[in-house]
């Protein structure tokens, strides 16, 4: 009996042990229909190179549980071509003034809901509240403003540059970078000839083209994305450059100076807009409002060292950036500039000459 009782006891204990193990397995088994973690939204930005502080972008990603995909273009025509090929792939783009007009005419931009942009309404600089290219500000928000001129390294360029005509001097052969931008490059030649940036006269545009063919001998590269780095590293002596980029170069290399040519130049503003059919329109609106928060804007523009369109943020920025001589001189001479306009079908003439200029065909 004792043996039988012992046997029964062992069987019962063994059974209980198995049951206990089975229960443990059931407790740790994941439910078959466990909810998956929501994937982060992707905000697709198509813009100019170096146009945001990476930390400012990272902070927006963290606050909004999203990821930012950032792609760059070299000029407005490249942006337009990409948009025509499928602009809904992007949520935010940054066209310049005249390109905003073109895109509005082509129905490429979403109208903005300004009730969701209180930071913009409160902080946008007064001079850009009703720009000629979008007077009611229905489709865009100004972001960066500036003027185009000539940056030069005084270590190599002994006589200060004062004129567009100086670029043609033979001693600068192989030492000049021009912007990789059709309208910008033709503007400098048109101004040299005393003509408007927006000329649609075939004779004037062809005359500008002939001047540019002569200038090609002196050109090291047509470059918009890396011209700052090449000037800072002294790979080039002279660059056809935007005032903000020249200021950026000057901080890293004080030998770099900036000239607003005496013949006049062009003034510009780059803007933020939302393409028609953007997949993440609400997230894009949040981003536009975020970028116009004064503290965010001050941090962003301290990084970029560009002229800020956020009036409230400017006093919050580092003094050495706001008072940089290049930016101050460019602002003082903005009356020497002419806005670019949409030139309609005349752009095909510019495009033809531009292709020939860069390829020799």
Predicted regions and their residues:
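Conserved C-terminal helix/tail region of periplasmic/extracytoplasmic solute-binding proteins
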Residues: 330-361
